[in-house]
């Protein structure tokens, strides 16, 4: 089982090697990188390429590790017992299976995505150490050991909001997705917009990287935001010339709200455009 890329995802040689290293070592692949660099999409594309069902667990600040294993619905069982329900006799009716339970008991190998693990509290990764390492956990309510029939291919993504514990890191294979350079970005754009005119691509790419390289920018635009912007430019049939307008009444290129998400960054970009015009 080897990942060799897909036509829908521009994967570097290093990234493909990392995916295959995680498969060989039978360890989770921990993927870090800026938001919008394709971390989540990587899991989706690998699962598709290897013909594996994909289970996804999207982490929030309130998510607890136990939810990934199972939850016992004691309230419903108490209510049903008061109503004299027959199903109350079987405790399995009140076990809500989490994504790890589903992955471990699947009839075939699956891919498992634990998305944005750094959003949870600091103890969250530690609480999953044993389960991800040994691929098993115990359900005390039903008194059964849930052990993986087939070891899932685990992807874990992080935006670096919090540092992850060393003990957790030791159990993963790590890959950092670097922000694409202009050449790689052009390949990514070509996958999504194969018929895009070179003039519009060149003008949009120049504007995009000018914005990203602005000193003092609070939030740099991501790959996904560039793709959103291009989609809007095409939908509105905006020509390449409009992105490099010399009209002093036009402060910034059209639809730049797809790239810049606060007023300070818009103001910074307006100053850059003004300086560039004065230097022509």
Regions found by a protein language model. Name each.
Residues 1-280:
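C-terminal regulatory/interaction module of P-loop NTP-utilizing enzymes
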């Amino acid at each position: 089982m080897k990942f060799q890329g897909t036509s829908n995802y521009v994967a570097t040689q290093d990234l493909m090697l990392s995916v295959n290293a995680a498969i060989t070592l039978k360890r989770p692949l921990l993927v870090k990188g800026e938001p919008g660099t394709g971390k989540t999409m990587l899991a989706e594309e690998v699962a598709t390429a290897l013909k594996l069902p994909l289970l996804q667990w999207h982490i929030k600040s309130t998510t607890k590790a136990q939810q990934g294993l199972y939850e016992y619905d004691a309230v419903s069982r108490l209510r049903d017992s008061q109503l004299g329900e027959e199903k109350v006799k079987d405790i399995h009716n009140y076990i809500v299976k989490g994504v790890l339970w589903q992955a471990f008991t699947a009839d075939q190998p699956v891919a498992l995505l634990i998305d944005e693990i750094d959003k949870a509290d600091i103890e969250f990764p530690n609480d999953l150490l044993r389960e991800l390492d040994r691929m098993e956990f115990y359900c005390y309510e039903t008194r059964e050991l849930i052990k993986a029939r087939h070891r899932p291919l685990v992807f874990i993504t992080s935006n670096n909001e919090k540092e992850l514990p060393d003990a957790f890191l030791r159990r993963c294979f790590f890959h950092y997705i670097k922000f694409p350079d202009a050449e790689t970005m052009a390949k990514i754009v070509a996958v999504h917009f194969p018929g895009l005119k070179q003039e519009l691509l060149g003008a949009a790419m120049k504007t995009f990287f000018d914005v990203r390289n602005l000193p003092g920018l609070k939030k740099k635009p991501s790959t996904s935001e560039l793709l959103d912007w291009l989609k809007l430019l095409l939908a509105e049939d905006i020509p390449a010339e409009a992105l490099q307008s010399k009209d002093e009444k036009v402060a910034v290129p059209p639809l730049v709200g797809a790239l810049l998400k606060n007023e300070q960054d818009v103001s910074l970009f307006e100053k850059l455009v003004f300086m560039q015009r004065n230097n022509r």
